[in-house]
């Protein structure tokens, strides 16, 4: 699967798909995500694609309601609202869905790079989205997701470190780790703090460039936002912003900018 930010040994690399190189769609890889499978149409109606006009897919995100998208801060830094659009209502980057304009970008005031602490942000849509069978919001979990829980990761991330972007949305079940286990397995404990939740399955499975900002879901509720990892699917944990840790920031930020 995809991911935009990846830690290589102890160094975090931010791979901004739009700013570095254009992501090339490749139907040959449509069934070859890193350990995942093609998501059934409509199975993740909250999933959106953050698009850069003229480039295409750059990051993932989640619809929280008809005006707000939750994503990673590093997907927003350096952009103006007019630089980004949000694709909703489709599992395909080539057809279907609707592109929506954005009128506000907000990210956590204590977002830290290169550790990627507080790597969480919000996008406000210019106009309310119309919900349908393929476009739905997702609730977020206000309590911590359990350790050793099976959670679902979706995204249009690369199928391998240097692979192309799959045309269709990919889905992968992964398992949550304790932060202590995550720090030990990551080999860089400074990158993991209370605001993170980590997942791991095995080598050959995980997030990759382009998944950043996308959703991690547990029992139908949003628990994580893709932040960082070791590219790609190499048997190291992936790190996510822990939504329960930031739920008050999310709530107040939306309320203060409604």
Swiss-Prot record:
Tissue expression summary: After blood feeding, expression is induced in the midgut epithelium, followed by secretion into the midgut lumen.
SUPFAM superfamilies referenced in this protein's UniProt entry, alphabetically: Trypsin-like serine proteases
Keywords tagged on the record: Digestion, Disulfide bond, Hydrolase, Protease, Secreted, Serine protease, Signal, Zymogen
Residue numbers annotated as active site: 74, 119, 212
Listed EC numbers: 3.4.21.1
Family assignment from sequence similarity: Belongs to the peptidase S1 family.
Signal sequence residues: 1-17
InterPro entries assigned: Peptidase_S1, Peptidase_S1_PA, Peptidase_S1_PA_chymotrypsin, Peptidase_S1A, Trypsin_dom, TRYPSIN_HIS, TRYPSIN_SER
A GO MF label: serine-type endopeptidase activity
GO terms, biological process: digestion; innate immune response; proteolysis
Gene that produces this protein: CHYM2
Taxonomic lineage from the root: Eukaryota, Metazoa, Ecdysozoa, Arthropoda, Hexapoda
SS bond partners: 59-75, 182-198, 208-232
Residue ranges crossing the lipid bilayer per the database entry: none
Pfam families assigned: Trypsin
Source organism: Anopheles gambiae (African malaria mosquito)
Superkingdom per UniProt: Eukaryota
Subcellular location: Secreted
Residues at the site labelled Required for specificity: 206
Protein name per Swiss-Prot or TrEMBL: Chymotrypsin-2
Residues cleaved off as propeptide: 18-32
Reactions performed catalytically: Preferential cleavage: Tyr-|-Xaa, Trp-|-Xaa, Phe-|-Xaa, Leu-|-Xaa
Classification via Gene3D superfamilies: Trypsin-like serine proteases
Limits of the Peptidase S1 domain: 33-255
One GO term describing the cellular component: extracellular space
